[in-house]
Design a protein with these regions (language model features):
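Extreme N-terminal starter segment of soluble prokaryotic enzymes
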Residues: 1-2
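Short beta-strand-to-turn element immediately C-terminal to the catalytic PLP-Schiff-base lysine
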Residues: 6, 47, 73-74, 105-106
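Short N-terminal binding/cap micro-motifs at the start of the first secondary-structure element
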Residues: 10-15, 41-42
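Residues that act as N-cap/strand-start positions at coil-to-secondary-structure junctions
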Residues: 14-19, 98
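Conserved hydrophobic/aromatic beta-strand scaffold that supports enzyme active sites
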Residues: 17-22, 69-71, 103-105, 111
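Glycine-rich beta-strand-centered segment in the early N-terminal region that forms part
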Residues: 21-38, 51-95
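Cytochrome P450 core scaffold surrounding the K-helix E-X-X-R motif
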Residues: 42-48
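NAD(P)H dinucleotide-binding glycine-rich loop of Rossmann-like/cofactor-binding domains
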Residues: 81, 91-118
Length: 118
């Protein structure tokens, strides 16, 4: 699966297209086929190593971008508020990998249903 990320801390010149494993949702997670992302100042700070002391990511590569929208393609066993096919948007926790990938997994508590005209 393709993603956009980096293999060392630095500026935007470190970004590259990565080949990463396609994630599977855990019990309280959904898998989302990502259709859009945004890059904001927090992402750039993370890229420069600004959250290194507190992040849960211990190895490279790191996928960029917190904000996303897309469609649920798989759900974990304990997900009740969403179903496959739902259009959603959300924000990945800054301490974990981001959303600049073809598919991501995320806890159901970090997403919302997208408006009908979305």
């Amino acid at each position: 699966m393709r993603a956009i990320g980096y293999n060392s801390y630095g500026g935007i010149d470190k970004l590259q297209i990565l080949e990463v494993e396609s994630p599977k949702p855990k019990r309280h997670e959904v898998a989302v086929k990502v259709s859009a992302i945004s890059i904001n100042p927090v992402d750039l700070k993370k890229m420069r190593g600004g959250f290194k002391p507190i992040t849960s990511i211990k190895k490279f590569p790191i996928i960029i971008a917190c904000d996303f929208s897309g469609e649920i393609v798989e759900i974990g066993n304990d997900v009740g508020a969403f179903k496959v096919g739902d259009k959603v948007f959300g924000m990945q926790d800054i301490l974990f990998n981001g959303s600049a990938a073809e598919k991501i997994t995320i806890s159901q508590k970090y997403i919302s249903l997208a408006p009908n005209n979305f």
